[in-house]
Amino acid sequence: MKISVIVSTYNHPSYLTLVLDSLKNQVNAGEYEIVIADDGSGPETKKVVEDFQKIFPVPLIHAWQKDLGFRLAASRNNACKLSSGDYLIFLDGDCIPKKDFVEKHRKLAEKGFFVTGTRVLLSQTFSLDLENQVTRLDTNNFFKLFRHFFDNHFNKIISVFYNPFFPRKLDKNNWKKLRGCNFAVWREDLFKVNGFDEGFTGWGFEDSDFAVRLINAGVRRKAGNFAVTVFHLYHKELKTKQEGPSWDRLLLTLKQKKVACKKGLVQTKP
């Protein structure tokens, strides 16, 4: 089974560097590739990708689109079209994975399920130190991880550690609280729902819509807690409000029990 890791990014090359550095050093990952879903970043990001392409042990592909505002759904669809994996892991370009991230996702992969991961939020100070290479994040050093937590650099710590006994199928039909920064789906299921709905522009709810349509298609949710946690570098987050065009679009998907979107991997005329 070949895996494609789709990394979303927009004009934050220093954070992307930290993410790619970890993806470059994955252990027991099997066959995989990285595809950058770039929502219109400038030349600095292009240089980061080109520099990594020279030293990366697996294919590293750059899927770039023109900057026309926040178009995460479209950039992910572009990356998916260029990918060749049987199984796709979606990761944000400000989330540092552990060295066994791909390996653990591979072990969780199961036909008929998509996997949702979790994240640990990093403090602004610690994120800045990582960005400026003042310190480094050793994701395999348990002592240092606990120390970072007690120094208030992490918002939580227990979820960082692997628990093979965690019940993973309790909320099989629950689409809420999906973290778009860390989830995985089979390629055949991605195409079954026609990918991400590019009708979502601006911040929010495109991930929820994707999860709802997967569930409507009969794909169930599997929790990646205590297995594929990522470290989320600090940035100010916009809060999604349950109002506006994107929220209304999600409600329509729920009401109509929609499966395939019209404006996705394949564009359907109205």
Give the ranges of each region predicted by the language model:
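Short aromatic/hydrophobic "clamp" motif used to bind/position activated sugar donors
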Residues: L88
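A conserved acidic beta->alpha catalytic loop
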Residues: S22, D38-V49, C95
